[in-house]
């Protein structure tokens, strides 16, 4: 199957396994990547050493692309940004904060940036800032405070956006 997302991430199927705290660790992520989709290591509540070890452990289990999810409200986000840039997963998903200042530093390190967006306004901002793709999440997604469902967000966002969703 060939889509904008499969081409961007060099994966076989246009499926991104979500970052679920305490569940999305290296074994799951590598298994998803090895099956032709891509996985995301959830960093919520984790420290820098754990983050580095998880990325390295995942690389030992797969040579396929995978990503990490960084919650921008994390008190140690700057340290985690440095670790992610050093370890170079294929992509990073960004949520729970303003992703715009982080897009260029990650891209300069060769890491694709895929922010999670809960609104058309943020979707336009991250596209204008150069994000590689975006994940649209509505109010039914865990931990999100938006007031629209994913379906209604998609109806508003897709006609306005040219990057992969």
Which residues make up each language-model segment?
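Active-site entrance/lid segments in N-terminal catalytic domains of soluble metabolic enzymes
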Residues: 1-164
């Amino acid at each position: 199957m060939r889509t904008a997302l499969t081409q961007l991430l060099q994966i076989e199927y246009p499926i991104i396994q979500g970052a679920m705290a305490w569940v999305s660790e290296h074994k799951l992520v590598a298994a998803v990547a090895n099956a032709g989709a891509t996985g995301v290591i959830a960093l919520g509540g984790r420290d820098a050493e754990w983050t580095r070890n998880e990325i390295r452990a995942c690389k030992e289990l797969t040579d396929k692309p995978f990503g990490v999810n960084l919650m921008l409200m994390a008190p140690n986000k700057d340290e985690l940004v440095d670790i992610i840039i050093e370890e170079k997963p294929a992509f990073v998903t960004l949520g729970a904060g303003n992703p715009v200042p982080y897009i260029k530093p990650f891209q300069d390190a060769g890491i694709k940036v895929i922010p999670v967006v809960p609104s058309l306004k943020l979707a336009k901002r991250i596209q204008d800032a150069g994000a590689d793709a975006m994940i649209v999440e509505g109010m039914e997604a865990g931990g999100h405070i938006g007031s629209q469902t994913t379906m209604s967000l998609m109806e508003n966002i897709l006609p306005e956006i040219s990057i992969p969703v």
